[in-house]
A protein has these predicted regions:
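ATP-binding N-terminal substructure of ATP-dependent carboxylate-amine bond-forming enzymes
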Residues: 1-105, 109
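Active-site nucleotide/adenylate-binding loops and adjacent lid/helix of ATP-dependent enzymes
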Residues: 103-136
Length: 136
């Protein structure tokens, strides 16, 4: 069960794109503080955040500083090294879990997961080269 995150808490968002911006705007309206972590400064989400952290997703010191500044963490895009989320999960709650990121990082895993759970998806085939594409 997910523990309730009370207004006034600081939510950390990994990624600074438009989705993070919309999330941050909604979270702030509900009374939360928002910190973002993004590779590039002045990101769309960073522009509306209470605090923006900038650095590589492999910069352990910068990630640690970000993690220490928040109560709970989420992510807004899938191009984050899974190991980073695994490390963060040992320090702070992270939602969704890193397993979700792993599934979303490739369309093959994403579609296979959804199909296995019984969700209706369009037929698909995974191809790795031109010969497999011709056969598909």
């Amino acid at each position: 069960m997910i523990e309730r995150i009370a207004p006034g808490a600081t939510i950390g968002v990994l990624g600074g794109g438009q989705l993070g911006r919309m999330f941050g705007i909604a979270a702030r309206r509900l009374g939360y503080r928002v910190h973002t972590y993004e590779a590039s400064p002045d990101s769309p989400a960073g522009q509306i955040s209470d605090r923006e952290f900038t650095g590589s997703y492999t910069n352990e010191a910068a990630i640690a500083e970000f993690v220490d500044s928040v109560d709970v963490i989420t992510f807004e895009f899938e191009n984050i090294p899974a190991g980073v989320l695994d490390w963060i999960a040992t320090k702070k709650p992270i939602h969704p879990r890193s397993e979700v990121l792993h599934i979303c990082q490739t369309r093959e895993r994403e579609k296979t997961f959804l199909h296995a759970k019984g969700y209706p998806i369009a037929p698909f085939r995974v191809v790795g080269n031109e010969d497999e594409l011709r056969i598909a």
